[in-house]
Amino acid sequence: MALDFWKSSHAQQWIFDKTEIWKQRAEDMKTYSEEEYSRLNIFWANFITAVATECAHSQANVGCKLRQQVIATAIVYFKRFYLRQSFRDMCPFLVASTALFLACKVEEHTTLSVSSFLKNTALVLPKRWGVAFETNSAKNGVLYDSEFILVEILDCCLVVHHATRPMFELLEDWKQHTLTSTNTPVKDFDQIEIQCQKVVNDTLRCDVGLMFAPHCIGLASISVGMELMGRGEELEDWLVEVDTDMDKLADCINQIYTMYQLWRSFDEKEEVKKLMAKLPKPNTPIPPPQQQQSSYHM
């Protein structure tokens, strides 16, 4: 997995340091502070997850539950798009729905109704956050045009390496290490897997996916997950033998904890309305694909 990752477009084009990330967001930083943008990161991930869940329950897609990997891929697409574009360039609600639609294709998920994503975007926002979704058109063509634009901005880099697989591989390695060194099996290993998987999913609400390799995020999620269970000391002997950059690991862990601290203090129902009130209106309507093709040279 590690070898495949380091040769991938993910590793070569979509890993940045913190300074680069905030520099690329310069246009939106004229509107939002870093803390406000970090709160928006939490909101956008929650919004995309909510739209995916709502679509799974819609009549058009009954019984079609989106896998977590589809949701995770959509969130990554969304974050990457807004490294190269600002909120003023294209409606983020439309980009979020488009990212989900594209992720379903890339992750080879069952084809979903295009109209459902538009419809459920309009349902989810007022129901959960009290925010209205305004679009000039509800026609399917709007979504297809925005899909073309999204692919263009992403440089057709659509394969995303997630932290879930390396996290499970690392957990298995730790389990075997513990059994070999202590002759005692790990207690409640299934609960540990569940907790660490939850942390991995939560990392989508901050920027670690734009900064660190999947194995680093997976290892950080294990460390945080075990600490949250009050069992962090059980990892100490094993961590000494893990071949990784400990400074990057510590940075990743710190960012996850910072995200959790911010999330706990984030009153979404009230604060999202204020954040959305500051959201810039797109400069122009979404141009047709051929016009976009001549405008972007990425």
From Swiss-Prot:
* Alphabetical list of SUPFAM superfamilies matching this protein: Cyclin-like
| Any single GO CC term annotated in Swiss-Prot or TrEMBL for this entry | mediator complex
**Pfam families recorded for this chain?**
Cyclin_N
User: Region (Disordered) spans which residues?
Assistant: 278-298
Q: Where is the Cyclin N-terminal domain?
A: 46-162
| Underlying gene | cic-1
Q: State the SMART domains in the record.
A: CYCLIN (SM00385)
| Family named by the database record | Belongs to the cyclin family. Cyclin C subfamily.
* Name of the featured protein: Cyclin-C
Q: Which organism is it from?
A: Caenorhabditis briggsae
Q: What does this protein do?
A: Component of the Mediator complex, a coactivator involved in regulated gene transcription of nearly all RNA polymerase II-dependent genes. Mediator functions as a bridge to convey information from gene-specific regulatory proteins to the basal RNA polymerase II transcription machinery. Mediator is recruited to promoters by direct interactions with regulatory proteins and serves as a scaffold for the assembly of a functional preinitiation complex with RNA polymerase II and the general transcription factors.
Report the record's Gene Ontology biological process terms: positive regulation of transcription by RNA polymerase II
Instruction: Give the primary localization class.
Output: nucleus
Lineage of producing organism: Eukaryota, Metazoa, Ecdysozoa, Nematoda, Chromadorea
